[in-house]
Amino acid sequence: MKLWKRASGALKDRKTLFTIGFSRKTSFRNPDLDSAIIHATSHDDSSVDYHNAHRVYKWIRSSPANLKPLVHALSSRVNRTRSWIVALKALMLVHGVLCCKVTSLQEIRRLPFDLSDFSDGHSRPSKTWGFNAFIRAYFSFLDQYSFFLSDQIRRRHKKPQLDSVNQELERIEKLQSLLHMLLQIRPMADNMKKTLILEAMDCVVIEIFDIYGRICSAIAKLLIKIHPAAGKAEAVIALKIVKKATSQGEDLALYFEFCKEFGVSNAHDIPKFVTIPEEDIKAIEKVINGVEEEEVKKKEDEVEEEKSIILVERPELQTIITDKWEIFEDDFCFTCKDIKETDQHRKFNMDPSPLPLIVIDEPVYFTHTLPDLITF
């Protein structure tokens, strides 16, 4: 059965190479590059064709014009395959291309194919589920890494000045996210101790060394910039990054132990992972607490200022009902005279002086015209 699969895979590769021999060179196709890609991503699971892989890398380094033929050939190769061997070799080839870090890679952004839901179509799922999971995890990392690398190259050429603290924090967070995705790439099934898987794990371990080293270097530079004058938001993010770096250091130690037991050659010598000194963590916490204390003190000062303000309230108008009023002579004469004249026909002989201020039982009628006190 295995011999039949190998023979079938070799026949497919030869057929593809035969077809490429009749194709013409265009802006999207390069027969020589296509041939190197087919050899580097063959159906042979016993070895990796490093010679043709390095030919592809030389094509990419030689001219940016070779990027389009590479993308076209790789996407065409991967989209048509149902073999985990071809898919994994294609991912390893892409990984090597990204490590070239040439300027033209900024045009790729995301990978030109999708293996997030890959499933091998040549064997039963019970035998290939581990390979499928491995390829999906590897693709997820490379897809994000390609986007991150493209963004970094673009920023470097757009503005060469130094990044701000916020930009450095953002970059470290992305690197930590990439490292987390790398740690998910591991063989989980018992039948995965294959030459091709070990080669892929070697590539993963090398990438872990590179990314973790960049994280440690960036954190060392960042700790110098986080001082009492820095903002609270920056200090909070920095503390989160430092704690995550400590946690990832522990995860890396376990991951390398697993790789060593599995037989990954690059993991035989487990490195000493850098630990963040406790003094640096406390220094960041002091910055955060110092900013919080300043904010609390500022609020307390504002409250004290509000308490020290004396509010001057205007007296409100009040209505007073009383029978003790000052009566001026003019008002008194006017009242007495008019009331007497008005009440002559009613035959009331009363002295108006004892009348109450507000008449309730008997209204007073005035026959003369009242003066207009509103019109000016």
From Swiss-Prot:
Annotated ranges, domain ENTH: 25-156
Gene Ontology annotations of biological process type: clathrin coat assembly; clathrin-dependent endocytosis
Main location: membrane
Source superkingdom: Eukaryota
Keyword Membrane attached: yes
Any one Gene Ontology molecular-function term assigned to this protein's record: 1-phosphatidylinositol binding
Keywords: Coated pit, Cytoplasmic vesicle, Endocytosis, Golgi apparatus, Membrane
Cited CDD domains: ANTH_N_AP180_plant
SMART domains per record: ENTH
Localization per Swiss-Prot or TrEMBL: Membrane, Clathrin-coated pit; Golgi apparatus; Cytoplasmic vesicle, Clathrin-coated vesicle
One GO CC annotation: clathrin-coated vesicle
InterPro entries: ANTH_dom, ANTH_dom_sf, ANTH_N_plant, AP180-like, ENTH, ENTH_VHS
Record's keyword annotation contains Membrane: yes
PANTHER family membership: CLATHRIN ASSEMBLY PROTEIN, OS08G0467300 PROTEIN
Protein name: Putative clathrin assembly protein At1g25240
Organism: Arabidopsis thaliana
